[in-house]
Amino acid sequence: MTGDLREGPVAPAAGREGAAGDGPDEGEPGSTHAARREPEEFGSARFLNRELSWLDFAARVLDLAADPETPLLERAKFLAIFATGADEFFQVRVAGLKDRHAAGIRSRSADGRTVSEQLRAVRARATGLLGRAERIFSDGLVPELASAGIEVVSYGSLDRDARESLRGIFDRDIFPVLTPLAVDPGHPFPYISNLSLNLAVVVADPETGEERFARVKVPPLLPRFVALGDDRRLVLLEEVIAAHLERLFPDMAIGAHHVFRVTRNADLDLDDGEADDLLAAVEIELRRRRFGRAVRLEVDSAIEREVLELLVTELELTDEDVYRCTAPLDLGQLWSVVGFDRPELHEPAWVPATPPRLAGHGEEPVDLFAVLRERDVLVQHPYDSFATSVEAFISQAAEDPDVLAIKQTLYRTSGDAPFVTALARAAEAGKQVAALVELKARFDEQRNIVWARQLEQAGVHVVYGVVGLKTHSKTALVVRREPDGIRRYCHVGTGNYNSDTARVYEDLGILTCDPDVGADLNDLFNHLTGFSRTSASRALVLAPERFRPWVLEQVGLETAAGESGRITIKVNGLTDPEVVDALYRASQAGALVELMVRGVCSLRPKVAGLSDRISVRSVVGRFLEHSRIYRFGWPSASVLASCATRDDPAVAHRAAPRSVGSDARYFIGSGDLMERNLDRRIEAIAPVRSPELCARLEDVLALGLADDTHAWDLGDDGTWSRVRGDRGVSSQARLQELAVERSRRRHPAEQAG
């Protein structure tokens, strides 16, 4: 079964337009009092396809690019995000499907599709989305940008003076960089690099009339949009090059010319168990990746048949791999337009707030270690400042003479690399410093190699992870000598140690000197840097040893509680079949299951007898939702009393039924509910115990569930619908307001961190 559950023996739950979590009445098919069928009895149609679910997420991003309520340059940003995301999808997910197809793998996906069926479905869905993106650009953004004084114009529409101006730019800045490559018996078909923009040019010898093919690569280091003198008009670089092809092919007749772009398989084929030197092996594999198999060919819609056939043949593709485009190729290059200094076309600038307990007095910085000795601090970025919290934690540790050791995992770090600088400074000061640099962080491999070498040169002990696993945990450990002995200070987060993404990714982190968390991190780093096995943890939940069984145990506890059970989870992805089935069983037992899944989701909610009590939401807004929160059980009265949104009539805080104890367990961490996170990565999940900090998490969850501005709801048929309500709740805007309100309160007794 691969279709809608309604095609089979299972009918959708009735009346699901009501409040999320409303269950069926006693005796209805989904009632916990009716005979219950095991989830497996619903067949493969109980799962949604992972690849199509990712494309659904891309569609939600695309909706924001078309939303007239979104500021104009923010719409351009979302279109650029969609385009770059689509590139990665083809480089990794489609490439993986094609590899499986070529290998003759016959196994089906969780939703029952063969590889061929998935490839056909992906092509159909992707074609529609890419076509919509083109229309948004051509019919929406271009005319609206022109109205705002930013004109994207074609070369053919320019007057003589403008063309002369561009000719000067071409001769001075563009022509010296170009390299035309001919194709003939003495010049084989050139290698076309991944995601490069190219011109396919047909030239003819005027004397013989013989036609030849040539390729001109559009230089990636030059601006994609060439600005005319007044900077108000922009012309595509490839159009400027095409208008001056006679300079590249003098004495030849210029025939057809078309823009094309190739996408290649970009996944690393690396067996780290066989590699003697992982860094060298990754470098070799990165060079090989340049020559990955082509998986997609984008061409302009007017391309001549002969030219297209040549490209398809030489790139070893099929017609199914060709995508004809009516808009400019590579809309990801809109980032250069997004950066224009036009504040009125952007969202109002957001300056992250310093958490009150971390705010110093005047020029005197706060003593972070003294703050943490009082109690834990919870930070949520970008609402709370990353620079004055997490960066300051590592920087202060590097400078503090009483700090003996610093250990940190680095998965993706930023270009300015403040963490790399701080760790190097600490090592040069004689501290014991260890860094796990994950060389297999996709698309950041080369950057991480550079950081690893810099750290090694500074005297940092650098390791590259555990064989067979990717280290995805976001953890830092500081060991400090104090009057009463050695104390360990820790940070466990949901997001990378990256100053750039911390401004646009929503993430959480806890700063603590809890002895159990410190001991667990000590064991974890010994495992990462040495040969020790991870021992039983005291506070943290670590993957791969404990994450899967822990999730199933926690879900099982709420399942056993029946209608008194409650599960609320916020993650980026939910695709693991075993976890999905466990959540189905919780729903069948009567537990309330509230899921916030930003991206891919294989669970099908609101199906009678299977998932009546499950709701799935996705919030897609200005900031990329990236935090992972796990809450099991009902919040206590003390937690609810501490919620900043407790008196907000638009935000519903559900109190536990009278017959139910209030014992919610709260956790944050790096792991999603996907097989790779559960089984093939090192992840760290930390408990949050303080009622004040749990209230902060409760606010995040409640606002996400109440959002009727940037939220989507998943239906039983697998379609996502934009939530449109009359309350006007934007969870992200409200969290900004709460951060400002917290920063204005300075008395420690009022602060939760």
What positions do the PLM features span?
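Cofactor-pocket helix-loop regions in the catalytic cores of large enzyme subunits
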Residues: N572
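Hydrophobic alpha/beta core scaffold segments
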Residues: L592-M596
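N-terminal localization/anchoring segments of enzymes in phospholipid and broader phosphate metabolism
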Residues: M1-I567, R585, A589, C601-G753
